Amino acid sequence: MRFTFVLVIAATVAVLGFFGINAEPMPDPHAEPYPDAAINPKSVQSLLG
């Protein structure tokens, strides 16, 4: 009985880990990739047109 319970828990953890569901929060897709990066004047000019 105990072996079956441990086997079910291990299989659940393995499946969730395979699909990428874990304790770490997912990164915010809307976050700036480099928040401390300096603004490049050329990139600003290209954005402004």
UniProtKB/Swiss-Prot annotation:
AXPX repeat segments: 23-26, 31-34
Protein name as annotated: Venom peptide 3
Keyword list, A-Z: Amidation, Repeat, Secreted, Signal
Leucine amide PTM positions: 48
Record propeptide residues: 24-37
Superkingdom: Eukaryota
Species this protein is from: Eumenes pomiformis
Intracellular or extracellular location(s): Secreted
Tissue-wise expression: Expressed by the venom gland.
Stretch forming the signal peptide: 1-23
General remark: Not found in venom, suggesting that it is a minor component.
One of the record's GO cellular component terms: extracellular region
